[in-house]
Every structure is written in structure tokens, then in C-alpha cells.
Amino acid sequence: MSNFSEVFARAQKTIPGGVNSPVRAFKAVGGEPVFIDHAKGAYVYDIHGKRYVDYVLSWGPMLLGHGDDDVLDAVRAKLDKGLSFGAPTEIETELAEKICNIMPGMDKVRFVNSGTEATMSAIRLARGYTGRDKIVKFEGCYHGHSDSLLIKAGSGALTLGVPSSPGVPACLAEHTITLTYNNIEQVRQLFRDRGNEIACIIVEPVAGNMNCIPPEPGFLQALREVCTQADALLIFDEVMTGFRLGLSGAQGYYQVQPDITTLGKVIGGGMPVGAFGGSERIMDFIAPVGPVYQAGTLSGNPVAMAAGLKTLEKISAEGFYQPIFDKTAALCRNLESAAKEAGIGFTTNYVGSMWGGFFTEEEKISNYQQVMACNTERFNRFFHGMLDEGVYLAPASYEAGFMSVSHSDEDIDFTVNAARKVFANIK
């Protein structure tokens, strides 16, 4: 059987960098990527058969865990009828109805193929609806790889050591205003000065691409207020937080209603999908009923819709979320205790089923500057140590971790015991 080095070398001959998304290449942590063969429940298995407790969960979608039998059955049933038709299907409406019934203030939703498509389309819609060009985002927040949003982006763009990407025209960058996440006064000052130029604010309600940074009290409410006063739109990028902080996402959790919401990940049950939605008044600006154009050959793919619909049906069950939230909290508390026993500066943030760990002496991490000051070298050693112990974390210190309903108390104990060993070795 080929080792990882051989498989990676082969991949690099035909795939740029050997991967189809940069963070997978392990550039941030060093070494060569683990190649996965299959997954089930809370575990992924590499091509050599080694099992890992998985806290990446395909970067968030697998809230039910990998290979949920009911989701797989729903997918198989759709597969027997064909893969794609390029025509409307009834299941698109069923999933749309389900999402609109769940998400506050969402009357209509448009399906696309990825989170990037969702945010890109939401920005275009906001500009078309308001007749304004400028958009506001926050330093370290990642909203996909469309040109307008790769300005001081988080996630993979941070691990590459650059705040944006070559190939983004300066004229687009000029229309993107970047502020500090969790800085309310900075937002208010901008809107006092230039509010009538701004089409929208786009924000991750919980920033999950500079690790896991929850909003400070009042921050999201302040965004809602300034947008309302300036007739700008507030976009919540809930590609990551959607259905992970509860059934109604971050907007339900924090009781702040955006004008447009972008979704992805969980709504496809692991299949490629994205969506954006809002009030009927705003969404009717989208073609074919409105002037703002958006289209996609594979949008609303029936197989992806089947996976998403079954996933949402299952997570809508009463009492579904609390056990996951409890396990997330227990994991974070116990990791902090293990680090303290080892004399290592380490703190965690968690909200719902999202979590993150920071190697720092600070007690609280709440913005991009603090994240960038954390000890990434120590994280890299921790990552590889945990990998050796059979725990799969995101291969970059700027990524959130995730919990699923499939993770057991034994998995949490296994993870914490592994961390104790690793903490002792990286002092």
C-alpha cells in the first residue's frame, strides 16, 4: 500500500499543490496531508486503516456524523431516479419550505452549489437592491473566494500568510471596506461618515475562519441598527453557523434578524450545496422575477436536496441539540484543565457545536489581532501530536472545530487523554 508521501507526490503531478482546497495541503502545520479512505459516525479512516476521532467533520456539514444511514438511504433513493435534470424538481420546493419555516424572516430561498456562490450572489443582490456599490466585511472573516470578498480574508488566506489574493482587481478592493470584528464604535463611525454609500454589511455571526470567535454582547444588534438607519442590508453568512448553534442558526441564538442569510454545509448533508434567502421583497429582485441575475446548471441538484431534507428532518427532532452542546462544552472545559495541569497557556471558545482552542496566556480571545498573536508553532506541534494519537483536528490554527451527535462521551474522554499526553510533550 502506498504511503502518504507517495500518494501526495502523485497528486501534485496533476492537481495544483496536490489538493483541491489549499488548507488540506498541511502548509500551515507542516508535513504531508493525511489521505482519507472512508468515514462513519464520529470517525474518519485513512488509507492505511487508522481511525481518528474527527472534529473537522468535512469542515462542518456532518452534524449527524459521517454516513448517517437515513441520509444515505434518502440519497440512494434519489440516485435510482437520475443524477441531474436541469429542470425543476419537487424536492427543491420541499427543502425550500423546510428552510423557510425554520429560519426567521426568510420568505424565499435560492439554491446554489456552494457557500462561495451563496455569498457572491447575496452581495450582488444587495448591490442591486440598494443601488450602491460599497460593502463592509470584517478582518479575518472568510466568505468564500469570490473577488469582492477576498480582502483581508480569513481561513486559507490567513494560512498562506497574505490577507488577500493576487488576481483581485484593485477596483473591486476599493469597494470593500474592512473593519475589526467586534468593534462596535468603528462600525458606527463608518456609517456616520459614509452610510449612504454602503450596500450591505456581511458578517459571520460567529467568526469561524479565524478559529472560533463569538460576537461580543451588542455587536450583532449594533450591526442591525446601523444597517436599518442607513437603508443598507445586513447579511449573515451562516454557511458555517447555520443549524450548528441551534435549529434557527446564529440569528435565532442571538435574536438578531438579518435581511439576507447565506447557508451551506449542513443543508446539503455532506453534498455540495449552498443557498441564500430573505424576505419576499428582497428575494423578488432575483431573476427571473427581478433584474439581478443569478443562475446555475446544477443548482437544486435533487440528490443534494434529498440529503439536505433528510438531515433537516432529523435535526428538527425535539431534544436533538442539547447533548451536542453539552459535549462541546465538556470537551473545551476538559482541554483547558489538561493544559493547565501541564502548565501550558491555552484557552477555548465555544458556541453551540462550534469550538476552538488557542495557545495563549490571554484568558479571552475576541478579535483578529488576538488570534494572530497566538502561538501557532505550539499549535502545529499539538496538531501533529493529536494526529499521532488518533484525533483529527483542522490542519490550521485559524479554523473552528465541530461536534456531531455521533460523538460519544468515550470519544471526548479519548480526546482529552490524548491531549494530556501531547501537552506534556510540547511544553
Curated annotation (Swiss-Prot):
PTM-bearing positions, type N6-(pyridoxal phosphate)lysine: 265
Annotated compartments: Cytoplasm
SUPFAM superfamilies listed in its UniProt record: PLP-dependent transferases
GO CC annotations on file: cytoplasm
Domain of life: Bacteria
UniProt keyword annotations, A-Z: Cytoplasm, Isomerase, Porphyrin biosynthesis, Pyridoxal phosphate
GO MF annotation terms: glutamate-1-semialdehyde 2,1-aminomutase activity; pyridoxal phosphate binding; transaminase activity
Chief location category: cytoplasm
Catalytic activity line of the entry: (S)-4-amino-5-oxopentanoate = 5-aminolevulinate
Cofactor needs: pyridoxal 5'-phosphate
Pfam families reported for this sequence: Aminotran_3
Protein's pathway: Porphyrin-containing compound metabolism; protoporphyrin-IX biosynthesis; 5-aminolevulinate from L-glutamyl-tRNA(Glu): step 2/2
EC number per UniProt: 5.4.3.8
GO process annotations (BP): protoporphyrinogen IX biosynthetic process
InterPro entries with a match to the protein in the record: 4pyrrol_synth_GluAld_NH2Trfase, Aminotrans_3, Aminotrans_3_PPA_site, PyrdxlP-dep_Trfase, PyrdxlP-dep_Trfase_major, PyrdxlP-dep_Trfase_small
Family, as annotated: Belongs to the class-III pyridoxal-phosphate-dependent aminotransferase family. HemL subfamily.
Complex and partners: Homodimer.
Protein name: Glutamate-1-semialdehyde 2,1-aminomutase
Originating organism: Teredinibacter turnerae (strain ATCC 39867 / T7901)
Lineage: Bacteria, Pseudomonadati, Pseudomonadota, Gammaproteobacteria, Cellvibrionales
Gene: hemL
